[in-house]
């Protein structure tokens, strides 16, 4: 009799737990650090060009990316973190930097939190994260925001 209740309780806990901000998850990034796609697109259109780093997979970058974005490696892996650190080494830590991935839904992105943590620890003071809730195609390209192919 107790077993079904225990199973139900454990299932409820499993459902609720991922919603909490966990270290290493995108939800651990402060809301104040997020920039919405329409905000970044408007800034680019107005000529305000932050340094933009794509921290996802190379194939995605090659298929389509934000104009001017630099590829900085898939930061969900150690070699990607090393690649990001190399890309960041030549950047002014006081200038505006926007990072994005867009490989998958925000809550499952393996790259964005690691990139945020790495650049924050390196001392970047004007660091923002492009909030892409679904994926780059749906939340940027299909909305008509500027894209470079290749």
Residue ranges and their predicted role:
Residues 8-17:
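Bacterial N-terminal signal peptides
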Residues 44-52, 68, 126:
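Short active-site oxyanion
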Residues 14, 54-55, 130:
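Active-site-adjacent beta-strand anchor residues
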Residues 41-46, 87:
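Short amphipathic alpha-helices and their capping/turn segments at secondary-structure boundaries
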Residues 31-43:
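A short, well-structured juxtamembrane/interface segment
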Residues 1-7:
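Bacterial N-terminal signal peptides that target proteins for export
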Residues 17-34, 62-150:
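Rhodanese-like catalytic fold shared by cysteine-dependent sulfurtransferases
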Residues 40, 51-56, 69-72:
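Short hydrophobic beta-strand that contains or immediately precedes a catalytic carboxylate
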């Amino acid at each position: 009799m107790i077993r079904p209740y225990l199973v139900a309780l454990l299932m409820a806990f499993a459902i609720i737990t991922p919603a909490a901000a966990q270290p290493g998850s995108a939800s651990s990034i402060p809301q104040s650090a997020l920039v919405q796609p329409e905000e970044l697109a408007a800034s680019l259109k107005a000529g305000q060009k932050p340094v933009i780093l794509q921290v996802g997979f190379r194939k995605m970058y090659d298929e389509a990316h934000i104009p001017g974005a630099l590829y900085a490696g898939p930061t969900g892996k150690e070699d990607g973190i090393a690649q990001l650190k190399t890309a960041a080494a030549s950047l002014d830590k006081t200038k505006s930097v926007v990072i994005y991935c867009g490989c998958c839904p925000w809550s499952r992105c393996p790259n964005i939190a690691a990139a945020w943590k790495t650049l924050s620890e390196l001392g970047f003071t004007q660091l923002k994260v492009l909030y892409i809730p679904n994926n780059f195609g749906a939340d940027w390209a299909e909305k008509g925001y500027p894209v470079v192919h290749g």
